[in-house]
Swiss-Prot record:
Protein's recorded name: Bifunctional protein PyrR
Source organism per UniProt: Streptococcus equi subsp. equi (strain 4047)
Family recorded in the similarity comment: Belongs to the purine/pyrimidine phosphoribosyltransferase family. PyrR subfamily.
NCBIfam families hit by this protein: PRK05205.1-4 (NF003548), PRK05205.1-5 (NF003549)
Keyword entries, A-Z: Glycosyltransferase, RNA-binding, Transcription, Transcription regulation, Transcription termination, Transferase
E.C. number(s) listed in UniProt: 2.4.2.9
Gene symbol of the encoding locus: pyrR
Example of a GO MF term: RNA binding
PANTHER family named in the record: BIFUNCTIONAL PROTEIN PYRR
Length: 173
């Protein structure tokens, strides 16, 4: 199994900053926006975007934590550990995840969201888009486009969970 670091800590920080600026530019009214991180690493990325928005715009946005496991079609998990600090009805939700691949996690996230309320709008921010979609899902905000083969894997590490920030590509061959 070969692993290669393709994004270091500084480049990852810049990608998150770029996503933050795009969110500011595309959302005229940020006070209706709720950031919703998809567990696990998407939550930490959403918090970092929240921190940058606070630094740049002096605006504190709510951050929710969305558990997609109970809504996935490829596993059976009963317990839902979703935590949403506000009612999402009518809100502009920005889902945040680390990697966009087939789109199945995002479909499950949307299913969970609509079980909680009726958002006004839902958009998607991902740190890495690696292609190979199986569902018609597209990210609105992308930190890095990293094309891969189907056998390769993208591994995003965040300091809060893994002790370091970096993105690697792993080839099991």
């Amino acid at each position: 199994m070969k692993s290669k670091v393709i994004v270091d800590e500084l480049t990852m920080k810049r990608a998150i900053t770029r996503i933050t600026y795009e969110i500011i530019e595309r959302n005229k009214q940020l006070d209706n926006v709720v950031l919703v991180g998809i567990k696990t690493r998407g939550v930490y990325l959403a918090r970092r975007i929240q921190e940058r928005l606070e630094q740049l715009e002096s605006l504190h946005l709510a951050v929710g934590e969305l558990d997609t496991k109970p809504f996935r079609d490829d596993m059976r998990v009963e317990e839902d550990t979703t935590s949403m600090p506000v009612d999402i009805t009518g809100k502009d939700i920005i889902l945040v995840d680390d990697v966009l691949y087939t789109g199945r996690t995002i479909r499950a996230a949307i299913d969970n969201l609509v079980s909680l309320g009726r958002p006004g709008r839902v958009s998607l921010a991902v740190l890495v888009d690696r292609g190979h979609r199986e569902l018609p899902i597209r990210a609105d905000y992308v930190g890095k486009n990293i094309p891969t083969s189907k056998t390769e894997e993208i591994v995003v590490e965040v300091v809060e969970v893994d002790g370091q920030d970096r993105i690697s590509i792993v080839d099991p061959g």
